[in-house]
Amino acid sequence: MKEKILLIWKHLKQGTLKKMWKQTLWIYQYGRRYWKAMILYTLLGLVGTGVSLVSSLISRDLVDIITGHQTGKLVSTFAAMIGFSVANILVSQASGYASTFINLKVDSEIKNDIFAKMLVTDWESLTDYHTGDLVTRWSSDASNISSGILNWIPNLIIYTFRFISALAIVLYYDPTFALFALLGIPFSALLSKPLLKRMRDNNQRSAAMNAKLYGFNQEAFSNIQTIKAFDLIHFYTEKLKSLQKDYVNMKLDFQKMSILTSVLMSIIGFIVSYSCYGWGIYRVWSNAISYGTMTMFLSLSGTLTSSVNSLVSLIPSAISLTISAGRLMDIVEMPQEDYSQDSAVRNFEKQHKSEGIGLNMQDLSYTYHNGTAVFANASIEAYPHEIVALVGPSGEGKTTMLRLILSLLTPQEGSSHICAGADHEHMIDMSPSTRKLFSYVPQGNTMFSGTIAENMRNVKQDATDEEIIEALKLACAWDFVEKLPDGIESIVKERGGGFSEGQAQRLSIARALLRRSPILLLDEATSALDVTTERKVLRNIMQDTYPRTCIVTTHRPTVLNICNRVYAIRDKKCEILNDVEIHEMIQTF
């Protein structure tokens, strides 16, 4: 038997308990930042408890004065009763305000911290999670942590103090009454035990289901045009109903057990209350206590019962906290990007910005986490005042190469450097820190809600109107922006609403040009433009006096003859095409 118990305990330590302990330590790292707030909240709670207990004693005296069991000044006792009642209200409201104020502050600080950590998490690892799941973890789980940090330990101290102080008063006047008041504790403990595992499982499933529902709604609202175009309204409505049905069934399944437990707890509460009431009547009848003392006992009996229930309720609260901590730890403990070269990159840019900055990547090999090999010994180079094109069928690795250039992905083999102009003597390793040297225009619509000017200034806060207009001209966007009634102050709706795809692409390119980064990456960023406009945009970039390096990915070979070099991505390599091959591509397009 002893060996079996030890085996079970070992299993618990290696499993749930070990995991919960690790999650608790993670919460503690945040909790110790706010120890002053926790002390303030605890002190307010203790003062409130003290005022409440003194009010019970004064209430006893007041009843005894009225019933004639005690002589005293009725008016002064009544005034004291009112005074402590008002004090209790003031302390309660002050505690509530302080709790709300501190909780909001802590919540925003923790969310900011989690948000910052999410943004520097390894990109490929982060893509394993749906964006709806990430938002749910950041919002709901982070709020749960902030609330728990402020409330859990202070409430443990407050409820324990309330229980012990009330119990001490009851024991002082009538130890037997304390037995009746504490009668429900063993039953509460026994009934709460089967709920704990179910509660943890339910909380985990509930969090996962909430994330799934949020992700579904987010995707549906983001793709309303597609849903309407394919006449999928009924399909998506039924799919939402199915998800909601699963969620409701999960909640009701747990609620059935909760109701049964609640009914049993209520019955036990009635038994305890009426036992205390009966014992109080008997003691009054036998002249052992006064009416005032019985009134105080009944009040303190409720305090004892509520304190025990409050302490028991901290257990599911702790479980919920550890689950939220675990969900956040899944994200923030993923590999983090290294930004230790920020200072070196800034200095490098400052020294060589006038001559321009290029890149040189040699013998790269890269395989995704899922085992898909994309590159093997691939090489690419691009220098200031050059336009370098990457061509190839979809899925061959054009976008992956741009991710390698941006250090969103790290090659398993090979070397990648940023260089001063075309000088291979002055180079710096590519890393997340070198992203500040790039302007990136990805596939699709990347405009934000707001005005055109606000979109432009997202990348350069101090940009003047003249600089914005100049960037719009380079991207061939000023022609249509100039004709708008509000010009650069015209409103851009969500996802570039109000503008055609071609116009939105030109605005995105203008925003990237405004940043005046040494290297410009265009990932199919001209796909919605007609050939003439596409060539004009690229020529403008090439003829600009700013020493910019430009790398474009494209499916259309019609602009390749204005590029300095063209790399064909095939067979996991980047091969430079000669003029004959480029001409053949243009002819067969």
What are these regions (language model features)?
Residues V51-R60, I153-L196, N249-L298:
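A hydrophobic transmembrane-helix motif
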Residues M38-A94, A98, Y172-T176, N287-Y291, ...:
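Transmembrane helix-loop-helix hairpins at lipid-water interfaces of multipass membrane proteins
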Residues M1-V51, T67-T77, S95-S99, N103, ...:
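Membrane-integrated ABC transporters
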Residues T400, S439, G444, N455, ...:
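ABC-family ATPase nucleotide-binding domain "signature/switch" substructure
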Residues G31, S99-N103, L119-I164:
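Juxtamembrane loop-to-helix connectors within ABC transporter transmembrane domains
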